[in-house]
Amino acid sequence: MLYLLIVYVVSVDRVNKVHKYLKTYLHWQQNSVFEGEVSSSQYQRMMSELFDLIDPDVDSVMIYEFPEKYLQKTILGIEKNPIDFIL
């Protein structure tokens, strides 16, 4: 399993499609930030389909991968959308 943090800046006409798509795999944190755990096959499928949704000449999607055993998250201020539980 991979733990991902995805941050994106995409054109206004694609932002809702990207947001809705990422919600099928990951937990929305705030604005254009998603995080969560995916399997290797989910990761491959997600990258392929995400690439089809964006325009690589205009849009930017940054994907950070973390081994789960090294994951530590610190939040300063209010947490916009807390994760109640992780399966």
Please tell me what each predicted stretch does:
Residues 1-5, 10-87:
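Basic nucleic-acid-binding interfaces
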